[in-house]
Amino acid sequence: PASSAASDVYKRQLLLNKHAGSYFYLAEMMLDLELEPDAPVTDHCGSCTRCIDACPTNAIIRPYVVDGSKCISYFTIELRGAIPEPVHGQMENWMFGCDICQEVCPWNRHASPTTEPRFSPHPRLLDMTKSDWLDLTEDVFREVFKDSAVKRTGWMGLQRNISFLGDA
């Protein structure tokens, strides 16, 4: 098992760095060295339940227990079938992923946006209207999301998500 004092696991089961919040990317190094693990970290959430209270699908069942199959991120990224009808009205405007639990976390209030240009949105996305999203072709999808995690859901998955939001 891996250990690190660089981040802690919090109630919503995301890694959190006390200085950077939970908006960061992970990397790993494969080493052939024996390293001494850092001391275990303490719970910094205290009695806060903002992430649990804010989750519209109740995917965070209780502290440190997340039912991924209820998470908006699962429905919009990983699910390959139809989004279940009971989720109607709970997805707000999330057509890919969801950051509600991160948005309400007090540890993220001072998080800095990345300055990494590779994480900037494709310029064509910045001015898209709802109509543009509904009319998005597979070719345009491939062009604007070729270097993006959004390609994981695929064009058909994104169309499903957009239609589902439009039906709600």
Label each region the model flagged:
Residues 50-73, 80, 91-118:
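Iron-sulfur cluster-binding cysteine motifs and their immediate structural context
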Residues 75, 79-96, 127-151:
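Short Fe-S-cluster ligation motifs
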Residues 37-46, 87-98:
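Immediate flanking context of iron-sulfur cluster ligation sites
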Residues 11-65:
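Loop-centered beta-sheet repeat module
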Residues 143-146, 151-168:
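Long, compositionally biased charged/polar accessory segments in the mid-to-C-terminal portions
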Residues 1-6, 10:
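Single conserved hydrophobic/aromatic residue that forms the stacking wall/gate
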Residues 113-128, 133:
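Amphipathic alpha-helical blocks and their helix-capping loop/short-beta junctions
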Residues 32-35, 39, 70, 74-79:
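A short, charged helix-loop
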